[in-house]
Amino acid sequence: MGQTYRIDRLNLITRKRRPQKVVNEARCRYLAKSQLVKCNAQNKHFDYLNFRGSHFKKVDFSFAKISGCDFWGTSFNKCNFSNAYITDCVFMGCKFIDCKFDTAHIEYTTIVNTNISGCRNIVLGKFVEVLSQYPDFQHTSDLEEVLEALKNNTNICKYKLLHLPGNKYNRLNIYLLQKKFSPEELPKLLWRISGKSNKNLTTYKRLELELKAEKRMV
């Protein structure tokens, strides 16, 4: 029997002739399958939010700061990212339709299997990685042993950071981790977090930062 988790998601929809709903700032939340329509997110800070499978329509993110967030299978329809600051995010299999990115700053971000032709006036920073195909990672027996053990970590599994449904690995996140840590380091660092709650490790970037913190303590 699969594990059940507490549902945490946003469902903000501004109806006709009603005041525009405002998106509150948030940090370290797993907000899968959220839905935001005709909302105001101007000048807001969003840190380490996981919007897997979410839908945004006519949301105004102008001048917002979006840091360390994950967007897997997320759709953006006629959203405004003008002058937004987007850093350390992951966009995987996303769909953009007629979105504005005028003077947006995008850096240290990974974009995979995502067509950005629907992003008007987008300019990608020097340290943005764009992958047309889902990557694989370097398999080792030590790594696979700790990945198997981490299947029992409730929050690591809930946030789908290392494992995906169908008993599959999250190859993208593991690929990104192997760019930051050596093949010898990564399994050891993952073991160090295996017995922890990891409640706040909601996105890839939070996981990376936690492993870096563990490395400093070794």
Where are these regions (language model features)?
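Tandem repeat scaffolds
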Residues: 1-152
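Terminal module of membrane-associated proteins
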Residues: 130-218
